[in-house]
Amino acid sequence: MNVLEIQNVSKEYGNKKALNSVSIEVKEGRIFGLLGPNGAGKTTLIRIINQITAPDKGEILFSGEKFKRKHIQNIGYLPEERGLYKSMKVGEQCLYLAQLKGLPKNEAKQKIHHWFKKLNMMGWLNKKVEELSKGMAQKVQFVSTVIHQPKLIILDEPFTGFDPINSEIIKNEIIALKENGSTIILSTHRMESVEELCDDIALVNSGECILNGTVEEIKQNFKEHIFEVKYKGQLKGNIQHFETLSSSEGYAVFKAQDKEYTHTLIKQLVEQVDVISFNEKLPTINDVFIQSISNE
């Protein structure tokens, strides 16, 4: 089932097309990576999903229903631009935001206690936001985003301000949220996070969706038939129909001249050496990103 369906959505600001007939589907219980260079249209799309602005054309469905104001209660949004009130105490801030999302006061207090204890934040409750470091404030905003257990969570650059330890903590919390049934849209320039977390991705450039699918499908579509081999013995000569990209004792990387020859590599190798391991090298999402944008 799709939690979110964006169908041919367009948005213009004056003469500039921020989005041009964009269509994507976000499946329930998965992490969806929304990728693109600066100015590609990602922020405009996120604002439309949050009903901060409206599309000029197109339609949005939420769990199969036409997207309405009531659905905002089922969305948690962590914006790239931080929005905490600096003079408020942290606990009061979280309580206020939780109640805005429809949680009764007592339930909100219980959930704040749960999350603050879980993330080792109990000592922050009576601090003012302005007393917090950037990373501490980011943790508070993350809790405020997920506290009402929204069906759809939108995280725009969620790792900004975090050291490696806290980045890992938040990454694990994102995985736990998915395992507990939440659907997550992750917008980030950290391609290693996309590799680790995302099931599906869409790549937006110049207001258009130029790539859309599962991470595995996209990697398969962009693969260049490159193989890494570890072996024992001595390679006696060139491998027919393959270019040797790199080679050292007991290790080599080969690229097929054409995909029709890929099945012949292992056969040629075992005639010369004892093969220890044989792996096809798939492109990283960073490779896919750079190639796709460069080709536009």
Language model regions located:
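Catalytic Walker B motif of ABC-type/P-loop ATPase nucleotide-binding domains
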Residues: I153-E157, F162
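Conserved ABC ATPase signature
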Residues: K128-G135
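Short, charged/small-residue-rich alpha-helical element at the C-terminal edge
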Residues: E224-E296
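Helix-to-loop junction immediately C-terminal to a conserved catalytic motif
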Residues: N50
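Conserved ABC transporter NBD signature motif
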Residues: K57-Q73
